[in-house]
């Protein structure tokens, strides 16, 4: 991966020890992590997204595995995005739901939904025991970029409807970044994960941000391959962003 860090030539990157891969159970992984003690992280965070990094709490990282380059950074060119038939059906199916943007501040309702989601959708994934502290550490960034996009049932007699999904989103200059989305596991038929991305795309369009960063696409992975459906998609090849291709080889040049 190439990093044009000027005027940040003294940025420090650390490579983590090997750890079990979170996507392929038979593989080991490692990451590049920017120095978490660097006081400039908040200021350069928007640029690191363009370098293929992601945020987890106050950590900025990207996969850097010796024998695998399956994790490919992707972003949606929102001005060129055209929903496909399935996505249009998803929007129509959920047309009565209410979306609002709120500050990235945890409340009991969000925490309850988060814990139900992890318990039912990701049991034994290492996160199903998360509580309030882990919620804050994982989802709420320290630099003020974060917002929560809530998706709810319609209000009844002035009372807010049931909270169905929360899309943790960073709002930066030139882009939005989809950090993490959790939703009501018993409403999976609604396609709430897809709906959240569609609303994030519309949000970026309204804010005149040309890109929505979706993290990493992994070809043929049952949880990560869905990102290819949001076209026009772009991939980061280690040097620059280019149009999405399922056959384009990636590199680990640094």
Swiss-Prot record:
KW Transferase (keyword) present: yes
Which HAMAP family does this UniProt record tie to the protein?
Bpt
Report the InterPro entries cross-referenced here: Acyl_CoA_acyltransferase, Asp_Glu_LeuTrfase, N-end_Aminoacyl_Trfase, N-end_Aminoacyl_Trfase_C, N-end_Aminoacyl_Trfase_N
Q: Which GO terms describe its biological process?
A: ubiquitin-dependent protein catabolic process via the N-end rule pathway
Q: Name one Pfam family in it.
A: ATE_C
**What is the protein name given in its UniProt record?**
Aspartate/glutamate leucyltransferase
- Which controlled-vocabulary keywords does the entry list? Acyltransferase, Cytoplasm, Transferase
- Gene it is expressed from: bpt
| Native source species | Xylella fastidiosa (strain M12)
Q: Which reaction does it catalyse?
A: N-terminal L-glutamyl-[protein] + L-leucyl-tRNA(Leu) = N-terminal L-leucyl-L-glutamyl-[protein] + tRNA(Leu) + H(+); N-terminal L-aspartyl-[protein] + L-leucyl-tRNA(Leu) = N-terminal L-leucyl-L-aspartyl-[protein] + tRNA(Leu) + H(+)
**What does this protein's UniProt record list under function?**
Functions in the N-end rule pathway of protein degradation where it conjugates Leu from its aminoacyl-tRNA to the N-termini of proteins containing an N-terminal aspartate or glutamate.
- Primary subcellular site in the record, as a coarse category: cytoplasm
Q: What is its EC number?
A: 2.3.2.29
Compartment list:
Cytoplasm
Task: Cite the SUPFAM superfamilies for this sequence.
Answer: Acyl-CoA N-acyltransferases (Nat)
